[in-house]
């Protein structure tokens, strides 16, 4: 089972995997651990990652990048309309009102949703992980910004489903960083001690996030998060682009914004310049050849000028930091360390601002680029049964307060309740109790819309169905469990109606406790149970809110036992004590049964099942097309490689191994094949290239084989000759009565002599015949045949010549009744054969003699 963590960023992606040796960040086919978040569409296939980024300037209209922030947003979203102006590709509205990306693919116009585009990127990451792990990848943990809303998170999960990934958890970036930091720390305070507070700061390509986390041994708790979704390294690049656009317009009379290719080149050069200024404070040049209208442009900038240009952006850094400290009620002296990650934190001015705010140096112990991916892989390993990981619980925080609104039975007034406050622990469940006579609706929304970087405050509308009054006409008690799950998504997980069923108590039967239905999952108990009851014009309509406890993957749920109906009447207790007494007359009893209720969810953003299946099918077809195109290109490259290889070697090492007539014919075929490749063979089916390759190999393989045989033949013949000499010498020694071989039977040795003579005769005949052959003719014998002869000779001779001499048994020792052993004369020979000294008797020990057991002392 694979364990993979995916950091899917706006600009680039990182893949971390868990192995026996720990967590490792893996490289792609270009030996680069960073995979650009870029997809390029061509007439035959898609290009994803590094290869797509290389085509970004030449195929700007069909190359898609910076699409992460489009998840879960409508086309008329103000953010989408603003970003649309800066993109090289077209954004158009989808039928469902979402964002569509229009590109030319397979020589046709195609419209892809953001989920499909992200699925394409995930396909590439999945393929890279599978190539590295050598096994299929299904389970994973994917990172998302902590400020992603419910709709955006659902959109990312849909993208993972399209590509067949089972996302075990959508993990907030900062929580992943905190896990990567804390799980390796051995000096964390104990659970009963004051926790260590660490602030994590992440400035990536497009956003700025901060979080405060409390660490104890074996656990971390996110105290709070703050962010600026529109402040990142991209904004610093844009400041440089704006500056140089104005300079080039004045200096060279060139408007870089009028041509998208020129603007993209300027963006790339400005990003390089920004990185250089992080390590150099001197003036640095910016040179672009043939920028526009065949004109070269040049400019320069230093770090101080850059910081002055970006002063407005640098001031924004402190805003989320102030907000975080206010929300968590922390003081700067309570913060033990400040860990920074993200590519943009390498800018010296950014580091300086953060350090100045906290009054202490920032720490860079984590890998700024890979920390998120490594944290995701650790979380995946914790959730996976295939890995045993040190016990470490993770408690996240809800970034935005969530409220519920509902209509009363009278439909005159509305009830509102905030079920999850800002920075509330997550994952978490709560049980709300309603008194209703019929179905009712609940609407979830974000309580503070101004703090949410998303235009829609509504999360969704949930209809609790099949609710009915009790048989006596009273309102039914409906329990609704609301939950923020491991993905950070709000949902109504279950709803049940408490139904009172009158029954008769049978003789001798024990009284049933009014518990939940056994086939219903028990609710989870909390550390603190609280009941919130507010005054309302209609009695009994305000729900009773029961905190149902935090659910994490590390802590299993425990049964809920707080219901009033669970109390056993005193009369029933008396009956339990009087089991042996004769039964009384039957009396009515009220049995409480929990009935599961269906909940219909109407969410702000969720792909329908039919649409999702269509996207899955489309992605499968594109994957197959990419595979076929790769195989076609591989076949074409094989033909081209074959042409160059044989043409080069026919005038070199292969020249002696082909006759002049065949040489000219083969060269002519190679030239014709090369011309065909660059003309009508430029775009042919895979089979056409396979046929061409077979035609070339039909003429080239015999030449290649003759060359290889000529190279290998002397070596194997020499090996055969050495074995023949070896066995011939042993046979001669045997005939000369050598003591080493006097134990071998003569009939056995005759077999050796016969085999040696036969093989020697065969070798002489072969060598004589081969000497008469020219090099351009096929050899008389192949090297594998000679190797077979060597093996055959060894099989016959080796068992005979390696026969061991029979062992000479040592004579028995004669013992006297009370004296030492008396050895026979032959005992000396026995000792020499055994190679061991006789043991001392009667505990006698002599100095300067070695013991029987040697010990090496360190």
Swiss-Prot record:
Location of this chain's protein in the cell: Cytoplasm
Post-translational modification remark: Phosphorylation on Ser-509 may be important for regulation of the HSPA8/HSC70 chaperone activity.
Superkingdom of origin: Eukaryota
Physiological role: Acts as a nucleotide-exchange factor (NEF) for chaperone proteins HSPA1A and HSPA1B, promoting the release of ADP from HSPA1A/B thereby triggering substrate release. Prevents the aggregation of denatured proteins in cells under severe stress, on which the ATP levels decrease markedly. Inhibits HSPA8/HSC70 ATPase and chaperone activities.
Polar residues bias locations: 533-555
Basic and acidic residues: bias regions: 564-585, 806-815
Assembly: Interacts with HSPA8/HSC70. Interacts with HSPA1A (via NBD) and HSPA1B (via NBD).
One GO term describing the cellular component: nucleoplasm
One Gene Ontology molecular-function label: adenyl-nucleotide exchange factor activity
Record Pfam families: HSP70
SUPFAM superfamilies, A to Z: Actin-like ATPase domain, Heat shock protein 70kD (HSP70), C-terminal subdomain, Heat shock protein 70kD (HSP70), peptide-binding domain
Modified residues (Phosphothreonine): 562, 816
Name by which UniProt lists this protein: Heat shock protein 105 kDa
One BP annotation, GO: protein folding
Species for this entry: Rattus norvegicus (Rat)
Sorted UniProt keywords: Acetylation, ATP-binding, Cytoplasm, Nucleotide-binding, Phosphoprotein, Stress response
Covalent S-S links between cysteines: none
Modified-residue entries (N6-acetyllysine), positions: 471
């Amino acid at each position: 089972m694979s364990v993979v963590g995916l950091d899917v960023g706006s600009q680039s992606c990182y893949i971390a995997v868990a192995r026996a040796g720990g967590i490792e960040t893996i490289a792609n086919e270009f030996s680069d651990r960073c995979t650009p978040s870029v997809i390029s569409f061509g007439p035959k296939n898609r290009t994803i990652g590094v290869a797509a980024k290389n085509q970004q300037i030449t195929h700007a209209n069909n190359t898609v990048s910076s699409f992460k922030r489009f998840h879960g947003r409508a086309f008329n979203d103000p953010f989408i309309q603003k970003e649309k102006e800066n993109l090289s590709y077209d954004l158009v509205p989808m039928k469902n009102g979402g964002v569509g990306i229009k590109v030319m693919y397979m020589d046709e116009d195609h419209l892809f949703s953001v989920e499909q585009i992200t699925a394409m990127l995930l396909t590439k990451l999945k393929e890279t992980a599978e190539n590295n792990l050598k096994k299929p990848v299904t389970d994973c943990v994917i990172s998302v910004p902590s400020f992603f809303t419910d709709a955006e998170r659902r959109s990312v999960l849909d993208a993972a489903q399209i590509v067949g990934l089972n996302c075990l958890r959508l993990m907030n970036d900062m929580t992943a960083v905190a896990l990567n930091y804390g799980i390796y720390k051995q000096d964390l305070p104990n659970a009963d001690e004051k926790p260590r507070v660490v602030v994590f700061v992440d400035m990536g390509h497009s956003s700025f996030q901060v979080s405060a986390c409390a660490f104890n041994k074996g656990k971390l708790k996110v105290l709070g998060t703050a962010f600026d979704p529109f402040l990142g390294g991209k904004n610093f690049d844009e400041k440089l682009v704006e500056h140089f656009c104005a300079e080039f317009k004045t200096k060279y009379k060139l408007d870089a914004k009028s041509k998208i290719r020129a603007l993209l080149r300027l963006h790339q050069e400005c990003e390089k310049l920004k990185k250089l200024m992080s390590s150099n404070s001197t003036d640095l040049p910016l040179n672009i050849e043939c920028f526009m209208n065949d004109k070269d442009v040049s400019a320069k900038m230093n770090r101080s000028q850059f910081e002055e240009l970006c002063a407005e952006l640098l001031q924004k850094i402190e805003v989320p930091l102030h907000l975080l400290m206010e929300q968590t009620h922390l003081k700067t002296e309570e913060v033990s360390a400040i860990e920074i990650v993200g590519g943009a934190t390498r800018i010296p001015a950014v580091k300086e601002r953060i350090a100045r705010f906290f009054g202490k140096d920032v720490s860079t112990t984590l890998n700024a680029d890979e920390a998120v991916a490594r944290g995701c892989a650790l979380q995946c390993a914790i959730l996976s049964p295939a890995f045993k990981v040190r016990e470490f619980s993770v408690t996240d925080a809800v970034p935005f307060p969530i409220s519920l609104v509902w209509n009363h039975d009278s439909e005159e007034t509305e009830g509102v309740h905030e079920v999850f406050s800002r920075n509330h622990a997550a994952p978490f469940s709560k049980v709300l109790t309603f008194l209703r006579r019929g179905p009712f609706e609940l609407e979830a929304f974000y309580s503070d819309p101004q703090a949410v970087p998303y235009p829609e405050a509504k999360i969704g509308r949930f209809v609790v169905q099949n609710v009915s009054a009790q048989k006596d006409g009273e309102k039914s008690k409906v329990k609704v469990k609301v939950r923020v799950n491991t993905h950070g998504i709000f949902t109504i997980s279950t709803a049940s109606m408490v139904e009172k069923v009158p029954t008769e108590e049978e003789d001798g039967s024990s009284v049933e406790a009014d518990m939940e239905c056994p086939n219903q999952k028990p609710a989870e108990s909390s550390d603190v149970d609280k009941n919130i009851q507010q005054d309302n014009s209609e009695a009994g309509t305000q729900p009773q809110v029961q905190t149902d406890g935090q659910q994490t993957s590390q802590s299993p749920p425990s049964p809920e036992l707080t219901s009033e109906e669970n109390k056993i009447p005193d009369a029933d207790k008396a009956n339990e004590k009087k089991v042996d007494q004769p039964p009384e007359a039957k009396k009515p009893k009220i049995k409480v049964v929990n009935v599961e209720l269906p909940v219909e969810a109407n969410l702000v953003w969720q792909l329908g099942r039919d649409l999702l299946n269509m996207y899955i099918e489309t992605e499968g077809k594109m994957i197959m097309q990419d595979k076929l195109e790769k195989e076609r290109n591989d076949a074409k490259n094989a033909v081209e490689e074959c042409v160059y290889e044989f043409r080069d070697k026919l005038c070199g090492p292969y020249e002696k191994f082909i006759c002049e007539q065949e040489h000219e014919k083969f060269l002519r075929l190679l030239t014709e094949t090369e011309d065909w490749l660059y003309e009508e063979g430029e775009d042919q089916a895979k089979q056409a290239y396979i046929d061409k390759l077979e035609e070339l190999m039909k003429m080239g393989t015999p030449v290649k084989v003759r060359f290889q045989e000529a190279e290998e033949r002397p070596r194997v013949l020499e090996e055969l000759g050495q074995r023949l000499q070896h066995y011939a010498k042993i046979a001669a020694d045997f005939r000369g009565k050598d003591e080493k071989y006097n134990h071998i039977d003569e009939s056995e040795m005759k077999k050796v002599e016969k085999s040696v003579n036969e093989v020697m005769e065969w070798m002489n005949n072969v060598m004589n015949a081969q000497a008469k052959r020219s090099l351009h003719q096929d050899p008389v014998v192949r090297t594998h045949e000679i190797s077979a002869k060597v093996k055959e000779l060894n099989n016959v001779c080796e068992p005979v010549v390696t026969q061991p001499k029979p062992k000479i048994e040592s004579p028995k020792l004669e013992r006297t009744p009370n004296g030492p052993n008396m050895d026979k004369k032959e005992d000396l020979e026995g000792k020499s054969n055994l190679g061991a000294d006789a043991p001392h008797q009667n505990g006698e020990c002599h100095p300067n003699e070695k013991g029987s057991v040697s010990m090496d002392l360190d």
